[in-house]
Amino acid sequence: MHIEEIASEISNSISLAKQIEPFSKRGLVLSIQEAYDVARVVRQKLGPAEIVGQKIGFTNRNIWNIYEVDEPIWGPMTKSSVSYSDSNFFKVDLSQFCEPRIEPEVVVCLKQKPEFNTGTPEISLDWIAPGFEIVDSIYPNWKFSLTDAIASGGLHGSLVVGKKFKVSDDTEKDLIDVKVSLYRNCLLYTSPSPRDS
C-alpha cells in the first residue's frame, strides 16, 4: 500500500469520524519516517490550515506499555484545531471525533523557534496556559502501533488554551509543584500529581 493510499484512508477516516483497522494489524509496517510522511500528506488532504504549534504525545513513559509505544510522538496543531478561552470555559463538539479522550495540559508558547544547529538549543518561553487537548483515535479501542499513531497526526483532535500567563524567573519552579484537579459532573474525579501525568 502506497503512502498516498494510506493518507487517503486516514484523511477520510478523520473527515467522516469513522474508525479504521490499524495498518500494523494488516501487516503494513511503516518506518517512523514513513509514518511522518503519511501524516504530512494527510494534512494536505484535509485542506490548507496554518500550523500554529506542535503537540508531543506519549511523554509519560508509565503508559508506554499500555499503548505498546516506545518513544514520544509529534503532531501538528493547526489554526482550525486550536481554540482560546480567557474565561477557561469552552464547549467542544465531540461528534466530529471517533473515540475522543480529554487530557489536561500545560500549554507552552516559545518566544521563537529553537535552532538545533549546535547541540542543545536555547529555549525561551513567552507564556504558559492551562489547557485541554481532545485526543482522538481513528483506530478502535485505542489499539495501534507507534507508527499508526504518528500517521494519523499524533492522535491530535483539538486543543483549548485557557488564560495565558507571562513567564517569569519563578515559573519553572512553580510548574514543578502545580496541581490539577479533574471534575466530572461537578464531582472531583481525580487529582494526580504532576509527576504522574
Language-model-derived ranges and their functions:
Residues H2-L188:
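Catalytic-core "active-site belt" of small-molecule-metabolizing enzymes
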